[in-house]
């Protein structure tokens, strides 16, 4: 199960890289998130369509989660992969735990930050700096775009880390409903950004559509 999940998760970045050859990043993100919204919402409705399982609600927090769990990271990854490889994008996602620990400590989620964990964090962030170091020594336009692409992927990982902390503070909620609502909120913003920035959706080839 874990190996299958790893293959599916890792191959996502390869498919994004291939799809970007035939569609702009904002509309690629829109297509991905709208498709996922439709499928997840259908499953949620078949399960009864209930969201909060108690009288306690948290709509504002859910709205924020919808943005930082889908809209922002999906967009950042698609934009960043114009300038970085799919392997780097996948590697950048592995930095998420580095952000979770200090965020958990900052938001007082009973996450202790002892010396051993602190040293581990320093080593992890040193690794991120090493990933960026080749770009710092060049300074041309290509390296600047590459650096920005890498930064976008790292920021996407930061969004996922922040989302994992915020979800801990949600009241009792149906997990499928949470996924559906997050995607629905995210799809609204992503499509709005795509129309505003890139204009009407482009005509894409059959090969890109299959990807």
Over which residues does each language-model region extend?
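Glycine-/small-residue-enriched transmembrane alpha-helix faces in small-molecule transporters
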Residues: 1-30, 79, 139-169, 183-192, ...
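Specific transmembrane alpha-helical segments of multi-pass solute transporters/efflux pumps
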Residues: 7-16, 41-93, 129-130, 202, ...
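A helix-boundary/kink motif common to multi-pass secondary transporters
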Residues: 24-25, 85, 112, 174-175
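Hydrophobic alpha-helical transmembrane segments
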Residues: 3-4, 30, 59-64, 91, ...
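Transmembrane alpha-helices of multi-pass small-molecule transport proteins
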Residues: 20-72, 97-104, 158-163, 179-198
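Hydrophobic transmembrane alpha-helices of multi-pass small-molecule transport proteins
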Residues: 40, 95, 103, 115-135, ...
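Hydrophobic alpha-helical transmembrane segments in multi-pass integral membrane proteins
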Residues: 72-79, 127-138, 186-201
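Loop-to-transmembrane alpha-helix entry segments
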Residues: 53-60, 90-93, 109-130, 146-147, ...
């Amino acid at each position: 199960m874990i190996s299958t999940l790893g293959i599916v998760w890792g191959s996502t970045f390869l498919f994004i890289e291939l799809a970007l050859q035939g569609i702009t990043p904002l509309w690629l993100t829109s297509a991905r998130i709208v498709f996922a919204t439709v499928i997840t919402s259908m499953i949620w409705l078949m399960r009864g369509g209930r969201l909060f399982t108690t009288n306690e609600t948290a709509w504002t927090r859910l709205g924020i989660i919808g943005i930082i769990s889908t809209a922002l990271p999906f967009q950042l990854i698609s934009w960043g992969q114009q300038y970085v490889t799919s392997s780097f994008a996948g590697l950048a996602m592995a930095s998420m735990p580095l952000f979770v620990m200090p965020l958990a400590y900052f938001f007082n989620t009973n996450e202790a930050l002892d010396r051993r964990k602190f040293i581990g964090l320093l080593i992890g962030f040193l690794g991120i700096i090493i990933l960026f170091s080749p770009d710092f020594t060049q300074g041309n336009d290509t390296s600047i775009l590459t650096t920005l692409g890498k930064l976008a992927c790292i920021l996407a990982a930061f969004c996922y880390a922040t989302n994992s902390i915020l979800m801990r503070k949600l009241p009792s909620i149906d997990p499928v409903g949470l996924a559906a609502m997050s995607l629905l909120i995210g799809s609204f913003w992503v499509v709005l950004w795509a129309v505003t920035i890139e204009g009407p959706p482009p005509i894409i080839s059959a090969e890109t559509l299959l990807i």
